[in-house]
């Protein structure tokens, strides 16, 4: 619990700036919901999903990357919208 609180404090401090910095989730499993501050000019978050030998996989982060066929991607423009 202390680690989670410390992580949230660090993310808050790092993301404080005079403009708005987008915050996106960057976790792969729902058990470890971590976030990242996107760089200047990045205005979207993404969540992409695909199936492999391990089952359904999901990746999250800043931006809106191009994906290969068979990969589903959802992009959005608000803080933590890719959860």
From Swiss-Prot:
Metal-binding found in the keyword field: no
Signal peptide feature range: 1-21
Record-annotated membrane-spanning stretches: none
Entry keyword Secreted: yes
Superkingdom, taxonomy of origin: Eukaryota
MF terms in GO: acetylcholine receptor inhibitor activity; ion channel regulator activity; toxin activity
Keywords (A to Z) from UniProt: Acetylcholine receptor inhibiting toxin, Disulfide bond, Ion channel impairing toxin, Neurotoxin, Postsynaptic neurotoxin, Secreted, Signal, Toxin
Compartment annotation: Secreted
Tissue and organ expression note: Expressed by the venom gland.
GO cellular component terms given for this protein: extracellular region
Disulfide bonds: 24-45, 38-62, 64-75, 76-81
Family: Belongs to the three-finger toxin family. Short-chain subfamily. Type I alpha-neurotoxin sub-subfamily.
Record text on subunit structure and interactions: Dimer.
Task performed by this protein: Binds to muscle nicotinic acetylcholine receptor (nAChR) and inhibit acetylcholine from binding to the receptor, thereby impairing neuromuscular transmission.
Record-given protein name: Three-finger toxin MALT0066C
Organism listed in the record: Micrurus altirostris (Uruguayan coral snake)
Phylogenetic lineage: Eukaryota, Metazoa, Chordata, Craniata, Vertebrata
